[in-house]
């Protein structure tokens, strides 16, 4: 483990298996982290990104505390939904999924989510999946059903249900289920290899010793995780809807293949609601990230909204809440702008400022170390901002203090990823053009035109501050 000033902080994470907070310990360097990525049959919605932002916070926290991390996030490019979409359009699976894969990476960048080390595509690991199925068949853990599909026998895995806390003996099991997604009421043997049906699958299939077909969704993640991280990993994360059946089935398959514990920690984020209701296209409250960006909200505003609540609490997404996040970011932006101003020179940081900064860093670290308690971390941040502003108002602030505070803000932003620093602000070309036109109008003393151009820039979400060195453009 890489050492840092924060590395002595103990990190506690809520493990879904034990239903308790546990001290995080890793014998691996780097930490092995696997997160379930997008199923690329459509554009990802904001509920998906609530999970991805939580996973990003988890990864950033590990890095903040001095761990190195190897992060794998899969791309599910073959399942019931992707196959149905490709067949409906009568195009190849690659042609169907490619635009959604590209959109996913663009969306991730707009939310400032750190990239994974590898994004494996399920379709690139079909041979390894076939090999795993053959092994499970040989060991009598899997069997071929009457429909020629291959199924995993959950009765052959005695601890099945340990993640979702199901007890097989207390439940009425169906014989088998071939769908990728199902609920606990339909508990059954699940599909490892789905036999080809021409009417349903069209031209999409793979050859195997078990006949034409394609792998089951649950097997895909098991194989990609083990191929890229090994038989045992440190952390597996996803949304609560992944607990059953997906993650439960991953455990059964993986541990049957390796005879080792699959993952030591399982973390899951809660659902996102929209105006207090479950997101649904029929209710008209279904949003993709692109919907919100098109309505004028920024990636950092959406990230802040998705980040601000504890990951194990349901998040109620409202437009009013998003506008409140805009104001919170404005407060952060104004503070950074104030800190980046010029102050009296000093050769050292004041003792009060140093104590103030160290106290804040301790409070922030303790908050995120307590199962990623982001609400407490943000409360500590805004208290720090309030106290620092008071110090500046009292004219007890030097350039050394400003540099110290700016360094602290940059350090905590490695966790938050939302603080808008002036140096990071990218002004769109069309805004730059308007600013240049305004400078021409000002040089010609055409004040009416200059004011009109300033208003136009403001309508696009930016302000212009005139200075001797030239105009400074800031995000409103």
Curated annotation (Swiss-Prot):
The record's subcellular locations are: Cytoplasm
Q: Does the keyword Methyltransferase apply?
A: no
Keyword vocabulary terms for this entry: Aminoacyl-tRNA synthetase, ATP-binding, Cytoplasm, Ligase, Metal-binding, Nucleotide-binding, Protein biosynthesis, Zinc
Coordinates of motif 'KMSKS' region in the sequence? 278-282
- GO terms, molecular function: ATP binding; cysteine-tRNA ligase activity; zinc ion binding
Keyword Oxidoreductase among record annotations: no
Q: Give residues annotated as binding Zn(2+).
A: 36, 221, 246, 250
EC category name: ligase
Q: Where is this motif: 'HIGH' region?
A: 38-48
How is the cofactor bound, in the record's words?
Binds 1 zinc ion per subunit.
InterPro entries attached to this UniProt entry: Cys-tRNA-ligase (IPR015803), Cys-tRNA-synt_Ia_DALR (IPR015273), Cys-tRNA/MSH_ligase (IPR024909), CysS_C (IPR056411), Rossmann-like_a/b/a_fold (IPR014729), tRNA-synt_1_cat_dom (IPR032678), tRNAsynth_Ia_anticodon-bd (IPR009080)
Pfam families listed in its UniProt record: CysS_C, DALR_2, tRNA-synt_1e
Q: Which GO terms describe its cellular component?
A: cytosol
Q: Which reaction does it catalyse?
A: tRNA(Cys) + L-cysteine + ATP = L-cysteinyl-tRNA(Cys) + AMP + diphosphate
What EC numbers are recorded for this enzyme? 6.1.1.16
Per its UniProt record, what CDD domains does this chain match?
A: CysRS_core (cd00672)
By sequence similarity, the record places it as follows: Belongs to the class-I aminoacyl-tRNA synthetase family.
Quaternary structure and partners: Monomer.
What's this protein's name?
Cysteine--tRNA ligase
Organism field: Chlamydia caviae (strain ATCC VR-813 / DSM 19441 / 03DC25 / GPIC)
């Amino acid at each position: 483990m890489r050492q840092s000033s924060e590395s002595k902080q103990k990190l506690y994470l809520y493990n879904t298996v034990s239903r308790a907070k546990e001290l995080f310990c890793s014998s691996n360097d780097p930490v092995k982290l696997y997160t379930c990525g997008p199923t690329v049959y459509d554009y990802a919605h904001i509920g998906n990104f609530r999970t991805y932002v939580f996973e990003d916070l988890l990864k950033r926290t590990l890095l903040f505390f001095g761990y190195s991390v190897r992060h794998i996030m899969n791309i599910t490019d073959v399942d019931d939904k992707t196959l149905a979409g490709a067949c409906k359009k009568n195009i190849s699976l690659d042609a169907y999924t490619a635009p959604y894969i590209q959109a996913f990476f663009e969306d991730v960048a707009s939310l400032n989510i750190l990239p994974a080390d590898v994004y494996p595509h399920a379709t690139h690991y079909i041979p390894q999946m076939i090999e795993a199925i053959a092994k499970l068949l040989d060991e009598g853990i899997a069997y071929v059903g009457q429909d020629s599909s291959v199924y995993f026998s959950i009765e052959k895995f005695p601890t099945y249900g340990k993640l979702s806390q199901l007890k097989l003996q207390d439940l009425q099991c169906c014989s088998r289920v071939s769908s990728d997604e199902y609920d606990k009421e339909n508990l059954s043997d699940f599909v490892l290899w789905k036999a080809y049906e021409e009417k349903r699958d069209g031209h999409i299939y793979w050859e195997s010793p078990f006949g034409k077909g394609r792998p089951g969704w649950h097997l895909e993640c098991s194989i990609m995780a083990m191929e890229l991280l090994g038989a045992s990993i440190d952390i597996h994360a996803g949304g609560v809807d992944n607990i059953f059946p997906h993650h439960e089935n991953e455990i059964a398959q993986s541990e049957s293949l390796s005879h080792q514990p699959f993952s030591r920690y399982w973390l899951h984020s809660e659902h996102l609601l929209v105006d207090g209701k479950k997101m649904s296209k029929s209710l008209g409250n279904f949003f993709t990230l692109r919907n919100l960006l098109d309505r004028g909200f920024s990636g950092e505003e959406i990230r802040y909204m998705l980040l601000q609540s504890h990951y194990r609490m349901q998040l109620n997404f409202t437009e009013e809440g998003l506008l409140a996040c805009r104001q919170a970011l404005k407060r952060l932006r104004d503070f950074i702008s104030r800190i980046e101003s010029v102050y009296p020179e000093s050769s050292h940081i004041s003792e009060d400022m140093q104590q103030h900064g160290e106290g804040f860093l301790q409070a922030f670290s303790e908050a995120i170390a307590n199962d990623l308690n982001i609400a407490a971390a943000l409360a500590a941040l805004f208290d720090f901002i309030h106290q620092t502003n008071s110090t500046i108002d009292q004219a007890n602030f030097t350039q050394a203090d400003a540099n110290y505070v700016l360094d602290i803000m940059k350090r905590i932003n490695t966790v938050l990823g939302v603080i808008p620093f002036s140096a990071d602000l990218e002004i769109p070309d069309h805004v730059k053009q308007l600013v240049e036109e305004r400078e021409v109008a000002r040089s010609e003393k055409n004040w009416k035109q200059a004011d009109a151009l300033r208003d136009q820039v403001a309508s696009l979400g930016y302000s212009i501050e005139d200075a001797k060195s030239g105009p400074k453009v800031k995000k409103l």
